[in-house]
C-alpha cells in the first residue's frame, strides 16, 4: 500500500506560485552560453576589488597597517 501512495505522489502536478511565475522568464536562458567574453572582464574587476578589500581587512586585523589617529587595542 505504501508503494501505491508513493506512485500517486509522483504523478501529482507541481503547484505554481506567483513568485515562480514571476521568476520564470529569468530562467528561460538556462543552459545557453552567450558568444564571446560577455561580462567576464567586469566580473574579474569586481573580484580584484574584493581581493583588495580582503587584504586591507586582514592587514588591519593583523595590525600591520598603522592608521593615523586610530588606536586599536584588543
Swiss-Prot record:
It comes from the Eukaryota. Phosphorylation is a light-dependent reaction catalyzed by a membrane-bound kinase; phosphorylation occurs on Thr residue(s) in the N-terminus of the protein. It holds the Pfam family PsbH. Keywords: Chloroplast, Membrane, Phosphoprotein, Photosynthesis, Photosystem II, Plastid, Thylakoid, Transmembrane, Transmembrane helix. The modification Phosphothreonine is found at residue 3. The chain crosses the membrane at residues 41-61. GO terms for biological process: photosynthesis; protein stabilization. It is found in: Plastid, Chloroplast thylakoid membrane. It is a single-pass membrane protein. GO terms for molecular function: phosphate ion binding. GO terms for cellular component: chloroplast thylakoid membrane; photosystem II. Belongs to the PsbH family. One of the components of the core complex of photosystem II (PSII), required for its stability and/or assembly. PSII is a light-driven water:plastoquinone oxidoreductase that uses light energy to abstract electrons from H(2)O, generating O(2) and a proton gradient subsequently used for ATP formation. It consists of a core antenna complex that captures photons, and an electron transfer chain that converts photonic excitation into a charge separation. PSII is composed of 1 copy each of membrane proteins PsbA, PsbB, PsbC, PsbD, PsbE, PsbF, PsbH, PsbI, PsbJ, PsbK, PsbL, PsbM, PsbT, PsbX, PsbY, PsbZ, Psb30/Ycf12, at least 3 peripheral proteins of the oxygen-evolving complex and a large number of cofactors. It forms dimeric complexes. This is Photosystem II reaction center protein H. It comes from Psilotum nudum (Whisk fern). The gene is psbH.
Amino acid at each position: 500500500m505504501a508503494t501505491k501512495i508513493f506512485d500517486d505522489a509522483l504523478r501529482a502536478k507541481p503547484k505554481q506560485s506567483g513568485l515562480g511565475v514571476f521568476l520564470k522568464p529569468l530562467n528561460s536562458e538556462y543552459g545557453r552560453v552567450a558568444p564571446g567574453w560577455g561580462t567576464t572582464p567586469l566580473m574579474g574587476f569586481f573580484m580584484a576589488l574584493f581581493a583588495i578589500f580582503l587584504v586591507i581587512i586582514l592587514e588591519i586585523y593583523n595590525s600591520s597597517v598603522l592608521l593615523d589617529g586610530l588606536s586599536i587595542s584588543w
